[in-house]
């Protein structure tokens, strides 16, 4: 089946780009690569320069910026934390409550070969005794 037959399908040629456009694209990539190298060198030396004067002032002030006015709404909401959580307490949580055990109908059934089908009271006592001895619990 099929062999070495190859078909030459003519594709549209995109080599009509002028030399000036090629040189411009090469120059752009060179500029981008040189900028990336400069950034990496600065990071390697451990120097990070921030051109923002506001950031520099904030760093000098120890992160305390005195230019921001106090917002009374913000302060009043923080003064009473019960207002922050009031809407959350009224909502009903639809998930499982871990204080209550799940109903047996929800639990998966064990495989039939794990447990015998019929339980005699003596079998149950023997099983509990064996489990307690395996777990080293005093009877």
Curated annotation (Swiss-Prot):
Subcellular location: Nucleus; Cytoplasm, P-body
PANTHER family named in the record: PROLINE-RICH NUCLEAR RECEPTOR COACTIVATOR
Domain of life of the source: Eukaryota
Organism encoding this protein: Bos taurus
Main location per the UniProt record: nucleus
Subunit structure: Interacts with UPF1/RENT1; preferentially interacts with hyperphosphorylated form. Interacts with DCP1A. Interacts with many nuclear receptors including ESR1, ESRRA, ESRRG, NR3C1/GR, NR5A1, PGR, TR, RAR and RXR.
InterPro entries: PNRC-like_rgn, PNRC1/2
Lineage: Eukaryota, Metazoa, Chordata, Craniata, Vertebrata
Chain positions covered by the region annotation Disordered: 1-111
GO biological process, any: nuclear-transcribed mRNA catabolic process, nonsense-mediated decay
Record carries keyword Manganese: no
Function: Involved in nonsense-mediated mRNA decay (NMD) by acting as a bridge between the mRNA decapping complex and the NMD machinery. May act by targeting the NMD machinery to the P-body and recruiting the decapping machinery to aberrant mRNAs. Required for UPF1/RENT1 localization to the P-body. Plays a role in glucocorticoid receptor-mediated mRNA degradation by interacting with the glucocorticoid receptor NR3C1 in a ligand-dependent manner when it is bound to the 5' UTR of target mRNAs and recruiting the RNA helicase UPF1 and the mRNA-decapping enzyme DCP1A, leading to RNA decay.
Gene name of the encoded protein: PNRC2
Motif residue range(s): SH3-binding: 99-105
Biased composition (Pro residues): 101-111
Regions of compositional bias (Polar residues) in chain numbering: 11-36, 48-59, 76-93
GO annotation, cellular component aspect: Golgi apparatus; nucleoplasm; nucleus; P-body
Protein name, per record: Proline-rich nuclear receptor coactivator 2
Biased composition regions of type Low complexity, renumbered to the chain: 60-75
């Amino acid at each position: 089946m099929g062999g070495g037959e190859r078909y030459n399908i003519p594709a549209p040629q995109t080599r009509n780009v002028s030399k000036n456009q090629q040189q411009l694209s090469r120059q752009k990539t060179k500029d981008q690569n040189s900028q990336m190298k400069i950034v990496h060198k600065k990071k390697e030396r451990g120097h990070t320069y921030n051109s923002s004067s506001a950031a520099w002032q904030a760093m000098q002030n120890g992160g305390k910026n005195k230019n921001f006015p106090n917002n009374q709404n913000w302060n009043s909401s923080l003064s009473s934390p019960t207002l922050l959580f009031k809407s959350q307490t009224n909502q009903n949580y639809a998930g499982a409550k871990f204080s209550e055990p799940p109903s047996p109908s929800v639990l998966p059934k064990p495989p039939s070969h794990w447990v015998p089908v019929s339980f005699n009271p003596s079998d149950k006592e023997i099983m509990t005794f064996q489990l307690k001895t395996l777990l080293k619990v005093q009877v």
